[in-house]
């Protein structure tokens, strides 16, 4: 009976000691991973502002190339009265005489082509 107790005690001691070793090993691995993660975060934190500055520079460069005259002037939407001589309907719309509605107010409206 003593041999059984000694055997179980020996197995128990080995299991505890190996379990503790595994726990220490996993703790070390976690520390290494967090240190690597921190280095990746530092790298990303340094890279992000650089990318943002590059994008901002490109956008500002494009804005400076455009002149005020190259922008599209305000246009009139669909179903809005327009002037026959100076139609400012948006792209895809044409200034036409209405068929039914609007004949009482103005003579021309913007319609789809």
From Swiss-Prot:
Propeptide feature ranges: 22-74
The species this protein was found in: Cyriopagopus hainanus (Chinese bird spider)
Gene Ontology cellular-component terms listed: extracellular region
Lineage: Eukaryota, Metazoa, Ecdysozoa, Arthropoda, Chelicerata
Protein's name according to its UniProt entry: U11-theraphotoxin-Hhn1a
Compartments it resides in: Secreted
Residue span of region Disordered: 59-83
Source species, domain of life: Eukaryota
Secretion signal, residue range per the UniProt entry: 1-21
Location, primary (coarse class): secreted
Comment on protein domains: The presence of a 'disulfide through disulfide knot' structurally defines this protein as a knottin.
Tissue expression notes: Expressed by the venom gland.
Coiled coil: none
Disulfide bonds: 75-90, 82-95, 89-110
UniProt KW keywords: Disulfide bond, Ion channel impairing toxin, Knottin, Secreted, Signal, Toxin
Feature: compositional bias, Basic and acidic residues: 59-69
Listed Pfam families: Toxin_22
Family: Belongs to the neurotoxin 14 (magi-1) family. 01 (HNTX-16) subfamily.
UniProt GO molecular function: sodium channel inhibitor activity; toxin activity
Function: Probable ion channel inhibitor.
């Amino acid at each position: 009976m003593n041999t059984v107790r000694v055997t179980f005690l020996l197995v128990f001691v080995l299991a505890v000691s190996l379990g503790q070793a595994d726990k220490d090993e996993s703790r070390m691995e976690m520390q290494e991973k967090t240190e690597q993660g921190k280095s990746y975060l530092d790298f990303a934190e340094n890279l992000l502002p650089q990318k943002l500055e590059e994008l901002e520079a490109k956008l500002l460069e494009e804005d400076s190339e455009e002149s005020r005259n190259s922008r599209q002037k305000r246009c009139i939407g669909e179903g809005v009265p327009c002037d026959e001589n100076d139609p400012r309907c948006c792209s895809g719309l044409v200034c036409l005489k209405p068929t039914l509605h609007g004949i009482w107010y103005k003579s021309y409206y913007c319609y789809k082509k």
